[in-house]
């Protein structure tokens, strides 16, 4: 993509769409007879993501002066600048689109009134944009977010509810709003209070245009800003400029879920404060608080400007500026900072004694050469102002401007200090000071670390070591990063896998080097990830005593100098039980990552999809409900899999696209649909089940279960109701155990599988004998492991088949050692602990409930007994037979009721399944015989005839005799009377 410069053309031609560009004659992109489409994106953005497709035309007013060599100009309206979130003169990357994507389907919203009228040629449209027809808007497009609306586009029209908000394109942009006017008699000594919020870019305060008028200030005017309620000696005022922040129409928001609507305007009493300025003011990053704004009144010392009738007062320039380097984990004290500082102060900067300066190193190769990181990146370097020399103005504090022309810069050694929170370059959810879903964990971390940063923190006797445990991908590192940003701490992240070595001596040396590196950049948090990898011998079976002793000594270092400023250690692990005892006891604080609730999962999904184009049918609330048991990393993987599914869907749509067409479609962007999320969710749930050892079961729905309506109702009341309406069970009165009993072959296992499928639950099937082990204590461990896997895969159903073989009555078994009694006791203990786990359910199945230990049937355990009997009447048998033959191809003459009339009166579901299997085998034999004789073509379908079913019915023998059925009914009456 070639570089181009945007020039605002005012007034913009009314006959040209506001989101079009005008090309000066003789430019690099000649316009053909059908016009030209350009793909635009800001030059600062990465080439990933959609670009803005705009029409480029040549007009009579497209004249622009070309000042020497450089990027070609593009004449645009102010509307297009707002869409791209750029200012006049900004650079963009532009390339011609040879074949813009043709839209196959579009949903249009219209207001009550005249129709759309006839189509006139292909029209370049975008999702969320108003059409030339009054009162109409593009609500949804397929397959791309923007493209050509032509004769081949299928249209769906709906009526817009309520008053439609107009796009900025529908307004009159030929007459821009007048600039703010401030009277000459404005009260210059007025002091105002505004509520500060962390945000904005650069070094200036951001306010709304109306707020600037109410303050009586000019754009770019200098003001004193200070915290309200501070004592005079605790916080000095700081100097800053005031800039107007307009609502931004960025491209991601335009093509996203809220397409076509501008950003919320800044409130009048609100001011955006950059992170560095808020830190120097001593503000809390989460709650900047009330700020006092006062106009800077000192007479300007700048040279007289002959072209202006008035000058805004500004601070003087400093003659000398003495700064100190703040060592950080990624930049040492011996770095080459001359060129970096020269580039930074090429623009005049405000400096005050005691301030921390944040200097960007982007594009400076020498910084990468001196970086301490294995994979260096361009980060920020911090300096602290030690002294300023100049003619101090009479004001609340001594503030100067420093630049390369008026100021001599002196680098005066190093010092230790906290630093302001700055973005790390990752996506917004991970850069947040309160990551969605992890707010409570970050608050706990800050509460543990903050006392060591107080003036009396050196008097604390305990060490500042925190052990953070949670499953992989649960957000442990993200939470630690957010806590460090809140507290202004450096973060040194060290994977423990990089500390492992062949010999204990090498591991010991690496540990000591890591802690020494951390001490040089205090106050710092040393983050040791996967701590369970340390302290084990080479075989991984025993402990390495030398490494454990060294690590414990470093963690419990009582040197007072190492705690001022402090060195704090946070270690993460997903297997806390694998930590050596001496290492674990060195951490006085242990925190656990909590399980995400449904509301927290929704907030994570909303943050991850904030800048993604979603289909109108995507329901994030329903998606969050289906993602129960997912951690933050799983939700991020869900978005990744959904994006891949969307790419696969477009490629499989039957569109014969070349590589160039695929590139144009990616530039136009395409939405993520509900089917993409559904496919991604199925993939993740399958992988999740395999990770926890859950078997992959076939998809069984209620349609596959014939009859048993009363049994279905009992199961749904026990399991589905707590999942769909948890607020109804807020008192904690819930059942988590369900026992299905009855004759064999009546569908008990099929019912459990159908519940797991219909309720979107993980299914853990456990056969009773497979938990029994010959070693002492191993059988109980197997029971504990089953419930631990279920809690990790929640919401989950544990299905114990043949429960009578696993939990017989205690005291009656003749096994040596009493293993069955201990297994029953362990099972009872695990069932009692399910009340603290909301989304784990236990279903047991047995033919002989009278053989079970009576303690299992007490309230709070398997307290809900459901009898699953054989089908005795023809109506219920017909429902079962219809469910089994639902996927069969039956001949038109087949009557299932006539087949049942030829069967024994009492049949179980297994008997009817055997009937269908026998009939299908007869049909297969007939089909093979007909194919060999050439009576049927090979392409014909296999049909099940009435004769096949009648032959199978004649050979059918019930699997359960009448005497056995009577015995099962007596057992049912016995337990029903209890």
From Swiss-Prot:
Chain residues that bind ATP: 470-477, 742-749
EC number per UniProt: 3.6.4.-
Subcellular location, principal: cytoplasm
PROSITE patterns per UniProt: AAA
SMART domains tied to this protein: AAA (SM00382)
Nucleotide-binding keyword on record: yes
A family per Pfam: AAA
Organism domain of life: Eukaryota
Annotated phenotype, changing residue 476 to A: No loss of function
One Gene Ontology term, aspect cellular component: cytosol
Keywords: ATP-binding, Cell projection, Cytoplasm, Hydrolase, Membrane, Methylation, Nucleotide-binding, Peroxisome, Peroxisome biogenesis, Repeat
GO biological process: peroxisome organization; protein import into peroxisome matrix; protein import into peroxisome matrix, receptor recycling; protein import into peroxisome matrix, translocation; protein stabilization; protein targeting to peroxisome; protein unfolding
Gene3D superfamilies: 1.10.8.60, P-loop containing nucleotide triphosphate hydrolases
Compartment annotation: Cytoplasm, Cytosol; Peroxisome membrane; Cell projection, Cilium, Photoreceptor outer segment
Enzyme class: hydrolase
Keyword RNA-binding: no
Catalysed conversion reaction: ATP + H2O = ADP + phosphate + H(+)
Residue numbers of Omega-N-methylarginine PTMs: 119
GO terms assigned for molecular function: ATP binding; ATP hydrolysis activity; protein transporter activity; protein-containing complex binding; ubiquitin-modified protein reader activity
Subunit structure: Interacts with PEX1; forming the PEX1-PEX6 AAA ATPase complex, which is composed of a heterohexamer formed by a trimer of PEX1-PEX6 dimers. Interacts with PEX26; interaction is direct and promotes recruitment to peroxisomal membranes. Interacts with ZFAND6.
Family stated for the protein in its record: Belongs to the AAA ATPase family.
Family annotation (PANTHER family): AAA-FAMILY ATPASE, PEROXISOMAL ATPASE PEX6
Function (record text): Component of the PEX1-PEX6 AAA ATPase complex, a protein dislocase complex that mediates the ATP-dependent extraction of the PEX5 receptor from peroxisomal membranes, an essential step for PEX5 recycling. Specifically recognizes PEX5 monoubiquitinated at 'Cys-11', and pulls it out of the peroxisome lumen through the PEX2-PEX10-PEX12 retrotranslocation channel. Extraction by the PEX1-PEX6 AAA ATPase complex is accompanied by unfolding of the TPR repeats and release of bound cargo from PEX5.
Protein name per Swiss-Prot or TrEMBL: Peroxisomal ATPase PEX6
Organism: Rattus norvegicus
Name of encoding gene: Pex6
């Amino acid at each position: 993509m070639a570089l181009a410069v945007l020039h605002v053309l005012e007034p913009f031609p009314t006959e040209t769409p506001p989101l079009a560009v005008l090309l000066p004659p003789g430019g690099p992109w000649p316009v053909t007879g059908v016009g030209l489409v350009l793909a635009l994106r800001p030059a600062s953005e990465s080439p990933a993501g959609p670009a803005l497709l705009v029409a480029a035309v040549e007009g009579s007013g497209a004249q622009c002066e070309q000042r020497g060599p450089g990027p070609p100009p593009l004449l645009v309206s102010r509307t297009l600048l707002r869409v791209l979130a750029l200012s006049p003169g900004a650079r963009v990357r532009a390339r011609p689109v040879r074949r813009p994507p043709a839209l196959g389907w579009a949903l249009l919203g219209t207001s009550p009134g005249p129709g759309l009228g006839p189509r006139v040629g292909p029209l370049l449209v975008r999702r969320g944009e108003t059409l030339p027809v009054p009162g109409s808007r593009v609500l949804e497009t397929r397959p791309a977010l923007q493209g050509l609306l032509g004769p081949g586009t299928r249209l769906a029209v709906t009526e817009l509810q309520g008053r439609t908000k107009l796009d900025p394109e529908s307004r009159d942009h030929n007459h821009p709003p007048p600039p703010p006017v401030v009277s000459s008699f404005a009260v210059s000594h007025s002091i105002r209070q505004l509520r500060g919020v962390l945000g904005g870019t650069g070094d200036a305060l951001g306010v709304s245009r109306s707020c600037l008028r109410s303050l009586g200030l000019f754009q770019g005017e200098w003001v004193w800003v200070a915290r309200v309620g501070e004592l005079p000696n605790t916080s000095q005022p700081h100097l800053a400029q005031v800039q107007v922040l307009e609502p931004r129409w960025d491209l991601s928001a335009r093509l996203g879920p809220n397409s076509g609507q501008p950003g919320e305007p800044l409130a009048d009493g609100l001011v955006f404060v950059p992170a560095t300025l808020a830190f120097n003011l001593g503000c809390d990053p989460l709650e900047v608080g009330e700020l006092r704004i006062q106009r800077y009144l000192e007479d300007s010392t700048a040279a007289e400007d002959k072209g202006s009738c008035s000058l805004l007062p500004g601070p003087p320039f400093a003659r000398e500026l003495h700064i100190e380097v703040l060592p950080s984990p990624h930049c040492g004290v011996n770095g080459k900072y001359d060129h970096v500082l020269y580039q930074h102060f090429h623009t005049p900067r405000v400096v005050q004694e005691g301030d921390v300066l944040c200097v960007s190193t982007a594009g400076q190769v020498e910084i990468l050469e001196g970086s301490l990181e294995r994979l260096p990146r361009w980060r920020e370097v911090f300096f602290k102002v030690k002294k300023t020399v100049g003619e101090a103005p009479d004001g609340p504090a001594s503030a100067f401007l420093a630049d390369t022309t008026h100021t001599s810069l002196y680098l005066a050694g190093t010092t230790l200090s906290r630093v302001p929170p700055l973005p790390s370059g990752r996506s917004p959810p991970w850069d947040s000071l309160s990551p969605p879903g992890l707010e409570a964990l970050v608050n706990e971390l800050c509460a543990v670390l903050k006392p060591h940063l107080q003036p009396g923190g050196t008097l604390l006797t305990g060490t500042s070591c925190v052990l953070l445990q949670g499953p992989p991908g649960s957000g442990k590192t993200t939470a630690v990063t957010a806590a460090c940003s809140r507290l202004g701490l450096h973060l040194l992240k060290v994977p423990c896998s990089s500390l492992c070595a062949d010999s204990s001596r090498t591991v010991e040396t690496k540990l000591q080097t890591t802690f020494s590196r951390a001490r040089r950049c205090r106050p710092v948090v040393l983050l040791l990830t996967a701590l369970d990898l340390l302290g084990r011998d080479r075989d991984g079976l025993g402990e390495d005593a030398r490494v454990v002793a060294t690590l414990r000594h470093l963690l419990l270092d009582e040197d007072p100098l190492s705690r001022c400023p402090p060195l704090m250690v946070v270690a993460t692990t997903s297997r806390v039980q694998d930590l050596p005892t001496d290492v674990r006891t060195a951490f006085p604080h242990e925190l656990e990552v909590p399980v995400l609730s449904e509301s927290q999962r929704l907030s994570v999904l909303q943050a991850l999809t904030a800048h993604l184009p979603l289909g109108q049918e995507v329901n994030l609330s329903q998606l969050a409900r289906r993602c129960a048991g997912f951690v933050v990393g799983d939700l991020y993987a869900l978005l990744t899999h959904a994006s891949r599914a969307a790419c696969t869907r477009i490629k499989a749509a039957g569109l014969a696209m070349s590589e160039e067409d695929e590139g144009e479609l990616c530039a136009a962007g395409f939405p993520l649909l509900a089917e993409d999320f559904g496919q991604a969710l199925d993939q993740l749930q399958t992988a999740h089940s395999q990770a926890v050892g859950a078997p992959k079961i076939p998809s069984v729905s209620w349609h596959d279960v014939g009859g048993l309506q009363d049994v279905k109702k009992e199961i749904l009341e026990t399991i589905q109701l707590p999942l769909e309406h948890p607020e109804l069970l807020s008192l904690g009165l819930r059942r988590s155990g369900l026992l299905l009993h009855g004759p064999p072959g009546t569908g008990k296992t099929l019912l459990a599988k159908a519940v797991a499928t219909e309720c979107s639950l993980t299914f853990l099937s456990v056969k009773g004998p497979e938990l029994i082990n010959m070693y002492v204590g191993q059988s109980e461990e197997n029971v504990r492991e089953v419930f631990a896997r279920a809690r990790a895969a929640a919401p989950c159903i544990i299905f114990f088949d043949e429960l009578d073989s696993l939990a017989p009555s205690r005291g009656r078994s003749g096994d040596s050692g009493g293993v069955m009694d201990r297994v029953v006791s362990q099972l009872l203990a695990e069932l009692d602990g399910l009340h603290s786990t909301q989304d784990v359910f236990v279903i047991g199945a047995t033919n002989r409930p009278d053989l079970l230990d009576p303690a299992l049937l007490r309230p709070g355990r398997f307290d809900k007994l459901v009898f699953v009997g054989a089908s005795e009447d023809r109506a219920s048998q017909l429902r079962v037979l219809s469910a089994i033959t639902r996927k069969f191809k039956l001949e038109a003459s087949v009557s299932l009721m006539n087949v049942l009339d030829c069967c024994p009166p009492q049949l179980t579901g297994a008997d009817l399944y055997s009937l269908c299997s026998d009939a299908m085998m007869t049909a297969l034999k007939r089909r093979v015989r007909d194919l060999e004789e050439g009576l049927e073509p090979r392409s014909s379908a296999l049909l099940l005839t009435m004769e096949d079913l009648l032959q199978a019915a004649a050979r059918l023998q019930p699997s359960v005799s009448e005497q056995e059925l009577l015995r099962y009914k007596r057992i049912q009456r016995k337990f029903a009377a209890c």
